[in-house]
Amino acid sequence: MSFLVSKPERIRRWVSEKFIVEGLRDLELFGEQPPGDTRRKANEASSESIASFSKPEMMSSFLPEGGCYELLTIIGKGFEDLMTVNLARYKPTGEYVTVRRINLEACSNEMVTFLQGELHVSKLFSHPNIVPYRATFIADNELWVVTSFMAYGSAKDLIGTHFMDGMNELAIAYILQGVLKALDYIHHMGYVHRSVKASHILISTDGKVYLSGLRSNLSMISHGQRQRAVHDFPKYSIKVLPWLSPEVLQQNLQGYDAKSDIYSVGITACELANGHVPFKDMPATQMLLEKLNGTVPCLLDTSTIPAEELTMSPSRSIANPGLNDSLAAGSLRPSNGDSPSHPYHRTFSPHFHNFVEQCLQRNPDARPNASTLLNHSFFKQIKRRASEALPELLRPVTPITNFEGSQSQDHSGIFGLVTNLEDLEVDDWEF
């Protein structure tokens, strides 16, 4: 009489059966953790380089029970409006967290399978620069995913609200170093990230850099062997098209590998430096043609913008696409003594320009891997840990709040944050 079972219960059973086959107990969705070591080694026959990675000590986990969380204000939606993102308080410790609640009843089986892959990867990965999931469980007909609240938001939030003409080079170096460390780990684990962009780079209260967007990760290991290339086109990828490499976009028999993420790092570097992503607002077909024809985005500064244009004051209503061409004539006006200086009248180091050029090589085989890039001269300027230097480099930006010492009875400070929280594109963090 299975037809009498409610849809939420059917979904719960479907998810339960599916996750048990793939290692449900490792995912701990229902809070049932048997004694002993139950962490399943995914892809057991994978390469030695994958097996050699040790698991560093990470943030402690939270209890997988809905009653342990006091949901406060809604700070975002996403996943085709099936996901609600709440600021919440974890009652046992008083820590403020982000709770992503996904309505499983409205999800298709394909969506649930998609989420299953994300949660499996979140349990498999353990790295200081990959956003940790503090708890994952099912409450009623909802999947709850709990993560720490990232008080600086994403790198996209920062350039969208404070650094609209781009960040300074040293801040970018710290951010990209954290991203490359995460990618080096992900690639050694046999995965391609496929969604590196500023909105998937989260920065915590103490200035630590985390790569998110695990939902798009794809394993390159099949039947115990690492494949030379994969051919799967990322699902729900409309938001990441400007960051995708030419070989991913063209979808041919040659496929792509982890070097496609390196191209995305180059695009993200331009995004952070210029204040907007290259190919912004360009139709998808034109974007593909530009990339296949070898159009290379660049950093906008005195070495890439003609001197005569640097004497003009650009209208902020029209952004330069960052494609190594001149600014649109309609976006310029003569500069006089009262006009502000050109926002791109700055000079990035030759090391930074070379770093971007290396990442954006049209031929993926010519791009360095993440490990090699971490030794690039661009990162020689880093002298301190990101947690020590980044908060200073992001000034005058301050974390939205650190929530320390807040009492559950007094939420006046919390609800006073709503205006600031609305500026964050939390639905695009994808945690």
From Swiss-Prot:
Keywords: Cell cycle, Cytoplasm, Nucleus, Phosphoprotein. GO terms for molecular function: ATP binding; kinase binding; protein kinase activator activity; protein kinase activity; protein serine/threonine kinase activator activity. It is found in: Nucleus; Cytoplasm. InterPro entries: Kinase-like_dom_sf (IPR011009), Prot_kinase_dom (IPR000719), STRAD_A/B-like (IPR047173). One of its GO terms (biological process) is activation of protein kinase activity. The protein kinase domain is predicted to be catalytically inactive. Component of a trimeric complex composed of STK11/LKB1, STRAD (STRADA or STRADB) and CAB39/MO25 (CAB39/MO25alpha or CAB39L/MO25beta): the complex tethers STK11/LKB1 in the cytoplasm and stimulates its catalytic activity. Belongs to the protein kinase superfamily. STE Ser/Thr protein kinase family. STE20 subfamily. This is STE20-related kinase adapter protein alpha.
